[in-house]
Amino acid sequence: MTPEELALRTDLIEACRSMNSLGINKGTSGNISVRYGDGFMISPTGIPYDKMTPEHVVAMGWDATYSGDVVPSSEWRFHRDILQARLDLNAVVHTHSTHATTLSILGRDIPAIHYLIASAGGSNIRCAPYEIFGSQDLADRVLVALEGRRACLLAHHGVITGHVSIARALSLAVTVEELAHQYLMCLPLGEPSILSDSQVADVLVKFQTYGQQIRSGHVGLRQAS
C-alpha cells in the first residue's frame, strides 16, 4: 500500500466517522467513495465506522472487480457510475440525514430558498424517483438527477453529494441537510419565496472567487474585491 493510497483510505474512514459525529448519519448506514488509480475506493458494507481500518476500505475497478474478503458497500453501483460519468467529481458521499431524507419521502426537490443552494451547482437540488437500494435502476436515476448538479435527494432513501475531494463532498452533505432543514421549517408557514435563476447564477459566478484562492507571484499589498 503506497503512502498516497493509505492517506486516501484514512481520509475516507475519518469522513465516515465524521458523518456520524456531525449528525448527518447514524450507525453503519451511508457510504463514501473516492477516485483512485484506474477505479475507486469505497467504504465496506456493514462494518461499524469506529472499527474500520484502512484494510477494510475496498478498491474497485470500473468493471466492479475487487480483491479480498471485504465486501464493498451495496451502493457501489451509483458510486462507480457517478465517478465514471462525472470527471469533475473525485469523491461521493451518501447519507441518510434526517431533514434531507424527510424531504425525499415527500418527493420534493429543494428549491432556491437560500443562496447556498448554488453550492450544489444550480438553482435546485432534485429528488430522484425511488428505486430499491443497490440497484442499477437507482444508479441510472441518480445520474439523471445529478445532471448539472453536485447533489441530489433519493426518494424514500437519503442524499448524495459529490465534489473534488472527500472533505468538500462531506461539507456539501452538511449544507444540503441544513438547506433541507430550513425548507421544512418554512413549509408550515406557507411556500417560501424562491431566488430566481438569474440570482442563483450570480451566486455561482461569485463562488468562483470565494474562499482562499491560490495566487502565485503576488507580493505586497493587494486591493480587496
Language model feature labels by segment:
Residues 1-225:
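Glycine-rich flexible loops
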